[in-house]
């Protein structure tokens, strides 16, 4: 069976405050979505994560977001397109320098949180993010949701789009993620999540919260590093995929 990428959000601590177990997750995933300082992450912590990723052969991606430290990037911001474009260029550039100093490089871009969800349907912001990536490096793939306006804008600019699925998030019937504010939005049982991911990879489909079967394009699977039991969930997913003969490998 073909391989699949496993990605996780890392580098999201700040100062003395730590979120998740970055070191443990880097021993499991093939790609690390590293924060760029706008929703989380400080320079020393980001350098540490990039160094560890380089040592383990884990690919580094720039996890760009709204300028929202207090809200962890999970709040929609009605920012002008030109300002958002500049913010994304800045974030990619900052992480490129840190990754280079760590002996690695940024090989893809993934929007974070509210920005990720917004550009599924918001044409102006989707275009701004896609254009920012193109301006920095048109060879950088973008990781996101298949069928999104963001993917349309990225493809229009010649960017490679990489579709991802979420291991531990519930899906709505329209294919979008259930809001974290709603009960059952974040899944927690490692064994059940692992079986769900294997089914996604093997069948190209997932069951929404109302029982609807949704077609799902999957090149990468996100296992959130900040979820309760994240390491156990990621380990279960990796082990189940490997047991089924699915190779864990990066897409870039």
Swiss-Prot record:
Keywords: ATP-binding, Hydrolase, Nucleotide-binding
GO molecular function annotation: 5-oxoprolinase (ATP-hydrolyzing) activity; ATP binding
Gene Ontology BP terms: carbohydrate metabolic process
EC number per UniProt: 3.5.2.9
Catalyzed chemical reaction(s): 5-oxo-L-proline + ATP + 2 H2O = L-glutamate + ADP + phosphate + H(+)
Statement: the UniProt record of this protein carries the keyword Nucleotide-binding: yes
Chain's role: Catalyzes the cleavage of 5-oxoproline to form L-glutamate coupled to the hydrolysis of ATP to ADP and inorganic phosphate.
Family: Belongs to the LamB/PxpA family.
Quaternary organization: Forms a complex composed of PxpA, PxpB and PxpC.
Protein's name in the database: 5-oxoprolinase subunit A
Biological source species: Mycobacterium avium (strain 104)
């Amino acid at each position: 069976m073909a391989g699949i990428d496993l990605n996780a959000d890392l580098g999201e601590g700040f100062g003395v405050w730590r979120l998740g177990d970055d070191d443990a997750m880097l021993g499991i995933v093939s790609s690390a979505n590293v924060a760029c300082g706008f929703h989380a992450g400080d320079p020393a912590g980001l350098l540490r994560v990039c160094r560890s990723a380089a040592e383990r052969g884990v690919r580094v991606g720039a996890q760009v977001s709204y300028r929202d430290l207090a809200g962890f990037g999970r709040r929609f911001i009605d920012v002008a397109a030109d300002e958002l474009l500049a913010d994304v260029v800045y974030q990619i550039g900052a992480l490129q320098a840190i990754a280079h100093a760590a002996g690695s490089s940024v090989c893809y871009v993934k929007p974070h949180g509210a920005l990720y969800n917004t550009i599924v349907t918001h044409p102006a912001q989707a275009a701004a993010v896609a254009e920012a990536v193109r301006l920095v490096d048109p060879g950088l793939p973008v990781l996101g949701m298949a069928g999104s306006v963001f993917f349309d804008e990225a493809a229009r600019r010649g960017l490679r789009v990489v579709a991802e699925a979420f291991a531990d998030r519930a899906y709505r019937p329209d294919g979008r993620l259930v809001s974290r504010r709603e009960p059952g939005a974040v899944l927690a049982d490692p064994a059940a999540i692992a079986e769900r991911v294997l089914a996604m990879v093997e069948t190209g489909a997932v069951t929404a919260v109302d029982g609807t079967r949704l077609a799902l394009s999957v090149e990468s699977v996100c296992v959130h590093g900040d979820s309760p039991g994240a390491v156990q969930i990621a380990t279960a997913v990796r082990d189940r995929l490997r047991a089924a003969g699915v190779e864990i490998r990066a897409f870039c």
